[in-house]
A protein has these predicted regions:
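A short acidic/small-residue loop/turn micro-motif
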Residues: 107-111, 115, 368-370
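Active-site-proximal binding-pocket segments
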Residues: 243-310
Length: 398
C-alpha cells in the first residue's frame, strides 16, 4: 500500500511540474488543448467541440425554412457517392437547386438540428461582416490602414503599409505558421489561448504587404479584431456576434441560434468555429450566390460580394501576380473548372459549394475528410469537389 501511495504522489508531482512548466514557458494554452481535444481522443479540433468551449450566441429572429423542391429526395444518391460520404463520417449533405432543397441527408447520428463547427468557413462569414461595416461607414474601405484600429503595430514599418484589405485577402505579410496538428503551433494557441488579441498583437510583419499570399488564420482573426474595434468605436455593435445576428442571421430568418467560440476575453474566434446546422449554412451560400441579396433586401453589398469571388490581386479584386487565382476575399475559387464554382471551406472537409451556372448550393459537413486534400496544394480540393460533390449534384438534375 505504501508503494502504491508513493507512486501516486510521484505521478501527482510530475503532473503538477508539467502544468507549471507549460505556464512558465508561455504554453499554458496547452492545458485547454489537452482538456478539450487530446483527452477526448482527438488529434485536432472536431465538429462537436463547441460543447467544450465558451461560446457567444448569435440570436435568430423569425424562422423561415428553406422550401423543398418538387423533386425533393426523389432521386437516390449513387452507391459510390454514399460510400464516400460514409467513409469520412459525413454528418450532413444538402443540395439546393433554385433556392429549394433538392436532396437532404443526415448520417452517423446527426440530424437537421445538429449544430456543427464551421471551422474556416467562418473566415468567409467574417468577410461578409467587413463588407457590411464598410457599407455602413464604420470602416472607410479596403484601403484603410490596419493601424487605425490596431495601433499596437504602429512601430512596425511593414505593418504601417498593411490595410484591412490585405488581411481579408491574406497577403498582409504577417508572420504565421498555419498548422493544425502540431501541439505547440501558433494556430493551436490561437484556438485554445485565453487572449487571442494579446497573442496576435505581439506578432510582427515579415513581408511587404501585398507581395506574398499565404493562407493564415491570424489574418482573419486580426481582421475580426479590427472590425470589432471599429464597430465599438462607432457604437454600431457591442460584439461581432451581435452584429452578425442583426445584419445576417435575423434578416436570413435562420432556423436556430448559432454559437461562436470565444476566448477568455469574450472575443469571437472569427477564423473558425461558428456552429450551426446544414440548412443555415446553405442560406449563407445562397446569400453569396444572390450577390448579397435576400428576399429583395441587400444584406451584403453586391460589389463587395463580387470582390469576394474575384481572384486575389489589386485592391479592386482584379487578378495580378501578387495573389493566386484560387482565392478571393476570404473565399476559395475554382474559376478554371467546368462548371465554375466558389466555396467556403473548413477543416476536416466542411464545404459550402456554390455553382452559379446551375444555381445550386451544396453543403457537406462531417467529422473527417480525404487526407490527400491539402489547401497548400491548390488543385487537390477543387478537383475532389468537382469529381465528387458537383458530379453527384448534376446527376440529380439531368
Amino acid at each position: 500500500m505504501r508503494v502504491i501511495k508513493g507512486i501516486l504522489i510521484s505521478l501527482a508531482c510530475i503532473v503538477l511540474i508539467s502544468i507549471s512548466s507549460l505556464y512558465l514557458t508561455g504554453n499554458g494554452f496547452m492545458i485547454n488543448a489537452i482538456k478539450r481535444t487530446y483527452l477526448a481522443g482527438n488529434k485536432t479540433a472536431n465538429i462537436n467541440d463547441h460543447k467544450a468551449f465558451d461560446v457567444a450566441t448569435i440570436k435568430a429572429g423569425n424562422k423561415t425554412p428553406l422550401p423543398k423542391h418538387k423533386n425533393y429526395n426523389t432521386t437516390p444518391l449513387s452507391a459510390d457517392f454514399l460510400a464516400e460520404l460514409n467513409k469520412y463520417n459525413t454528418a450532413a449533405l444538402l443540395i439546393i437547386k433554385d433556392g429549394q432543397v433538392l436532396s437532404e441527408h443526415y448520417l452517423n447520428g446527426y440530424n437537421e438540428r445538429s449544430k456543427t463547427n464551421s471551422f474556416s468557413m467562418a473566415k468567409t462569414i467574417t468577410a461578409m461582416l467587413l463588407g457590411i461595416a464598410i457599407e455602413e461607414g464604420h470602416i472607410s474601405g479596403l484601403n484603410q490602414p490596419i493601424t487605425d484600429f490596431l495601433p499596437e503595430f504602429k512601430d512596425d514599418l511593414l505593418a504601417q503599409k498593411a490595410t484591412i484589405g490585405h488581411l481579408a485577402k491574406m497577403n498582409s505579410g504577417y508572420e504565421w505558421d498555419e498548422n493544425y496538428y502540431s501541439p505547440l503551433s501558433p494556430t493551436v494557441e490561437l484556438l485554445y489561448g485565453d487572449d487571442v488579441a494579446d497573442f496576435l498583437l505581439q506578432g510582427h510583419f515579415s513581408v511587404e504587404p501585398g507581395e506574398f499570399w499565404e493562407y493564415s488564420s491570424a489574418s482573419t482573426q486580426l481582421m475580426g479584431i479590427f472590425i470589432s474595434r471599429a464597430l465599438q468605436k462607432s457604437g454600431a455593435a457591442k460584439s461581432l456576434s451581435d452584429y452578425l445576428s442583426r445584419k445576417i442571421w435575423q434578416p436570413l430568418e435562420m432556423n436556430d441560434d448559432a454559437l461562436w467560440h470565444v476566448d477568455g476575453q469574450s472575443m469571437e474566434l472569427v477564423f473558425c468555429c461558428l456552429n450551426t446546422n446544414a440548412r443555415n449554412f446553405a442560406k449563407l451560400g445562397l446569400l453569396m450566390m444572390n450577390q448579397g441579396q435576400w428576399n429583395g433586401q441587400q444584406i451584403v453589398p453586391a460589389d463587395f460580394v463580387k470582390k469576394m469571388i474575384s481572384p486575389t490581386g489589386s485592391i479592386d479584386g482584379t487578378a495580378s501576380s501578387k495573389g493566386p487565382q484560387y482565392y478571393g476575399l476570404s473565399t476559395w475559387l475554382a474559376h478554371d473548372r467546368n462548371p465554375v464554382f466558389f466555396w467556403l471551406s473548413g477543416h476536416l472537409g466542411q464545404y459550402v459549394i456554390n455553382i452559379p451556372e446551375h444555381n445550386m448550393v451544396i453543403v457537406r459537413l462531417g467529422e473527417f475528410n480525404n487526407k490527400s486534400l491539402d489547401y497548400r496544394k491548390p488543385t487537390t480540393i477543387p478537383d475532389y469537389i468537382s469529381k465528387t460533390y458537383i458530379k453527384q449534384a448534376l446527376e440529380l438534375i439531368k
